[in-house]
Amino acid sequence: MENTHTHKLYLYNDKKHSFLYVIACVINVCKYEPLQAEQCTIIAHKNGKCCVKNGDYLEMLELKEKFEKLNLISEIESHESYMH
């Protein structure tokens, strides 16, 4: 069994930006289609956060920095997974 780490980037609801602004930012940063970005934005609004991407740490850090430049709150979480 092989142990691997994946990193998840969560976008948080901040209650100060409009839905349209956040959707546009998610489209820009994550390269999502509008419907997918809208779904992420709604999940973040309803649950307080939404996992918008997962992958290696450096990729998630780059996306996190892009969200920060747009004044959106995001966080990287590390998750262990096991492959058989």
Where are these regions (language model features)?
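Terminal domain-initiation and capping elements
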Residues: 1-84
